[in-house]
Amino acid sequence: MQDVTIAYMQEGYVQVSVGARGKDTVDAEDHYIGQLPLIMVDLKAGIRYLKANNDVLPGDAERIVSYGYSSGGAVGVMLGASGNSAIYDGYLADIGAADATDDIFIVLGYCPITNLDSADAAYEWFQAGNQEYFLFNAMAVDMYGNDISDQITVGRGNFHPFGDNVLGGAHEDELAAKLYDWYVDYVQSWGFDLGDDGRDGAYFTGLVQLYSDGLTQWLTRYDELSTPDKEKYPDAAAYVQHLYDDYGADAWLELAEDGVTATITDYDAFMGSFISRNKMCPSLDSYNKASNEGSAFVDADGNRKHFSVLVRDLLGEMVEEYRDSDAFTAEEYDYIVRLADAYAADVDDEATRLLEIMSPANYVLHDDAYWASTLAPHWRFHIGSADGDHGLPAAWLMHNALLTYAADEIEDSVIEVSWDQPHSPAEIDVQDLYDYIDGIMADALSE
């Protein structure tokens, strides 16, 4: 953090870190007190403090830039979407927040794990071409919290065939298909161009184009970039050969005669060979509550709770659909019933409300007074090409929602895939970030 702060200061920026309650915050009795949406409440209070004291603090609090990746990217996107939302007024009044606005100026959303109300479905649409996955060490528990690390292999390189159901029960393939279909319907319901099979229409081809453009930019700028890849692949041609040799690019890549203009010709083949799936199904609200996202939904004693309304409802459908079916053994069907009951017990009306207000796309897609907010005028989403998490479909939904439903409220939204970058603040050259911020600030000062 210190190195990053120094770099920002050298660029002429003022970096502010706001203390906020979060998923690990406990009181003197070790009770958890950082439940959602309190991280948003505290950050908004910090923004209001900066604005209320703008005359005596360095910088300009009307030009706030949110910066974060993964869950931090999600929080930043939420700040940009929910500015001045009345939903938070009561919370802010309770903690004595300053009487000021809390909208921000620029959102830098790196691989934001957000829009959790549709995330489990979006991940199946995004990763449908990946027929195997690995699990992080934290996932080696069953649905009851028992350690099963002696029964399953975890960690990168230990892949399970999709549908292997390593946590027990014949559920994965069936639920994944339902989630995929639900997401196609969901995207279509907002008027976006997505074919019924989820693999044609501008919403799909536009996402694929992000990868094509990302690789093209990488190859075009390869000579000027500082990257460890150059130790093995001294020029763009050598790097391309690496894609053919190590990632089967003959099945998914077409390169123009110039040697740098790339086209991803088969998205699912590309996903299956280049991007690892690092989540089972369901991906974010996992059966064992052990996913990273599950850590945000805890009670005062730290017990995790299921949060996905969608998974709850689809499991309920499966219980009814297969009640008199011979598709599963009695033991397998009983497992599905127990899963459905576990989600139903956790996901109540309050959980539903929290999930909705913490999904930033809702502030853009809905036009009723409840969701009214002041959107950030500038949005920049970056996701690494090697990122197998939920960041790209989440950012893609936000980007399309902003351009379609809020074009008259914002000034710009850009989204890019940064090639050869993992789940991270993905930039192929950090100077690109500085140039983006400086350009917008210069335009603002000239107005």
What are the functions of these language-model segments?
Residues 192-366:
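Long, low-complexity, polar/charged, intrinsically disordered or flexibly structured peripheral segments
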Residues 121-123, 169-247, 252-255, 380-387, ...:
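C-terminal catalytic histidine-bearing segment of alpha/beta-hydrolase fold enzymes
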Residues 14-19, 65-68, 75-77, 105-111, ...:
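Structural recognition of the beta-strand scaffold that forms the well-ordered cores
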Residues 32-56, 241, 432-435, 439:
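Alpha/beta-hydrolase active-site loop
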Residues 115-117, 385-390:
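Acidic catalytic loop of the alpha/beta-hydrolase fold
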Residues 52-130, 355:
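Primarily recognizes the serine-hydrolase "nucleophile elbow" in alpha/beta-hydrolase
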Residues 1-40, 82, 420-422, 426:
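Cap/lid segment of the alpha/beta-hydrolase catalytic domain
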Residues 1-7, 388-395:
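Short, surface-exposed "cap/lid" segments of acyl-processing enzymes
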